[in-house]
Amino acid sequence: MPTEPETDYDPELGRKFIFVTGGVMSGLGKGITAASTGRLLKNAGFDVTAVKIDPYLNVDAGTMNPFQHGEVYVLKDGGEVDLDLGNYERFLDIDMTFDHNVTTGKTYQHVIEKERSGDYLGRTVQIIPHITDDIKRRIREAAEGNDVCIIEVGGTVGDIEGMPYLEALRQFAHEEDEDDILFTHVTLVPYSKNGEQKTKPTQHSVKELRSIGLQPDILVGRCSDKLDIDTKEKIGLFCDVPTEAVFSNPDVDDIYHVPLMVEEEGLDQYVMEELDIASEALPEDERENRWRDLVTQNTEGEVEVALVGKYDLEDAYMSVHEALKHAGLEKNVDVNVRWVNSEKMNDHHADRMREADAIVVPGGFGARGTEGKIEAIRYARENDIPFLGLCLGFQMAVVEYARNVLDLDDAHSAELEEDTPHPVIDILPEQYEIEDMGGTMRLGAHETEINANTLAATLYGGESCTERHRHRYEVNPEYIDDLEAAGLKFSGRAGNRMEILELGPEDHPYFIGTQFHPEFRSRPTRASPPFVGLLEAVLGDDPHTATTEEVSH
C-alpha cells in the first residue's frame, strides 16, 4: 500500500529490503541508523517505508508501562506501537499503519486463530514453517507499493525471543533476488582505558549472527567518535565484509544530524549500489535539502519550556520533546526542556517551573501527580505564562478551571476520583461496557471541527484539523455551558465531544489544550501548530493573530 497519496514508487525497480539487526547490547540506536538511511534514500527520490519487529509477546504496546518502555506511539489507524515507529514517521515523513509493527503476540495470535478455524487442515502447527511464513507475509504486505522497505529487528542477536524472526529473514533472503536484499548490522565499538577502539564485541556479535545463517553486508559501528581506518580494516577482516562496508555512527547531541553524518560516510551511496538502484537516484544537486538546511541553521535564541509530568524517563514523552524541537526549528530557536516532576511539586520543582518561559502538561494515566499538574496549570493561567495541555493536560485544565473559576472545589475527573461530586471529566459513553484494556480506547486519527475566529483556527489555518487520539474520558457535557459562561472557550469539537479549549486574548496570551495528541503528527519539516504557537507567544508574536504557516493536518 502506498504510504502517501502521491508516491515516487517505481514498480520497475521491484521491492528492495534492508534488514537491520543489532548486537552486543540493546539501545544502540538501530532505529535511528535505519531511519537515517531511509531519509537519505527518500532524498534521492525513492519511496521508502519501514517495519519494526518487536519480539515481545504483547500484541501491541498499548498496555506497556511508560516508566519501563517509554511512550506508546499512536498511528493514524489507531495502532498503539513502539516509539521507534515515531522516529520512522518523523524521519521519513510518512504515515504508517499498525501493519508496519510486527510483534510476537500479534503473529502467534493470528496463527493460533487460523489453527482454531481449521485453516491448516489438521497439520501440526510449528514455529517453522507457520510462524516464519506469517512473519514473511507481514513484511511483504507492509512493503507493497514502495521502492525500499527497511525492517528493524528489535532486541539483540542471540536473544531467544528473536530467533524465529532471524530464521524468517534467512528464509526471506533465499526467496528474493540477491540484489533485492541487504543486511545491515549495528554493533558497539567501545574504547579501552588506553583509548583504543575495541573490535572484539563486534566480532563476537557477527559470529553469533553468522551461526544463525545470516551474513551482514554492512556493519555500522556505534562509538563515541568515528571509527579510525585501522578499526574499520580489522572489523572488515574478521567479520568477512569489505572495509568500505564498515561505517561509523558516532554519538551526536541531536539525532537529526545522523542522516548528514552517515551521508558523509557514504552509507547511502553504498546501499544504493548494493541494491542496484544507484542509477535510478536523483542527481545530488536535485535531491531534497530542506532537512539539511533546517538542522544546520544557526539559531537566534533560546526558549525554556517546563514539561510537567510524572514519568521521569525522557522517552515517556519522546514525541513531545521532538515536537518542541520541531517548533524550535521553524522559529529558529533552541528549545531547552526543563523536567518538572508533578509528583514532587516542592520548592525546587516549583522554581524550575516558574523560571520557564512556557509550560506544557502532557498526557498520562492514573491519579499520581495530577495535583501537581493542576497546580502548574493554575500558575500558568494566573501568571500569563504560555500554556499547552495535551490529553490529560487538557482534562486537568478543565478541572483547574472548574475548581478555581467556577468555585467547584471538589471538581475532578471520574477516572481519577470516582466519588467526586463534580465529575467535569467523565467516561466516554461507548466505554461503559468495555472491560478489556488493550486496544479499546478512542484511538487514531479523528477530525475536529474548529470554530472560526479562534486561536485554534489561526493556528491550524482553517476550520478543521485531523489529529490522533488516545483516551477513554472526555469533558462532561453537563458542565460545558457553565465553563463557557465563565470564559473557557471550547473552540474545537467532534460532534458533542470537546476537543480543543482556549482562553481569549483578553484573558491570556496563549492558553490552549487539546484532547488529542498533536505531537504525534509533528515533523522536523512540518511542525505541529499548537507547539509553534506556544513558541510564538514566548517570542513576542501574537499567535491569536499571527500568520502561521498553514499545515495540512
Curated annotation (Swiss-Prot):
In short, the EC number is 6.3.4.2
Give the pathway.
Pyrimidine metabolism; CTP biosynthesis via de novo pathway; CTP from UDP: step 2/2
Q: Where is the active site?
A: C391 (nucleophile), H517, E519
Superkingdom, taxonomy of origin: Archaea
Q: Which residues bind UTP?
A: S26, K198, T199, K200, P201, T202, Q203, K234
- Give yes or no: UniProt keyword Nucleotide-binding: yes
InterPro entries from the UniProt entry: Class_I_gatase-like, CTP_synthase, CTP_synthase_N, GATASE, GATase1_CTP_Synthase, P-loop_NTPase
Residues annotated for ATP binding in this entry? G27, L28, G29, K30, G31, I32, D84
Keywords from UniProt, A to Z, are: ATP-binding, Glutamine amidotransferase, Ligase, Magnesium, Metal-binding, Nucleotide-binding, Pyrimidine biosynthesis
Q: Which residues form the Glutamine amidotransferase type-1 domain?
A: 307-544
Which family does the record claim for this protein?
A: Belongs to the CTP synthase family.
Q: What does this protein do?
A: Catalyzes the ATP-dependent amination of UTP to CTP with either L-glutamine or ammonia as the source of nitrogen. Regulates intracellular CTP levels through interactions with the four ribonucleotide triphosphates.
Identification of the protein by name: CTP synthase
Q: Which organism is it from?
A: Haloarcula marismortui (strain ATCC 43049 / DSM 3752 / JCM 8966 / VKM B-1809)
The gene name reads: pyrG
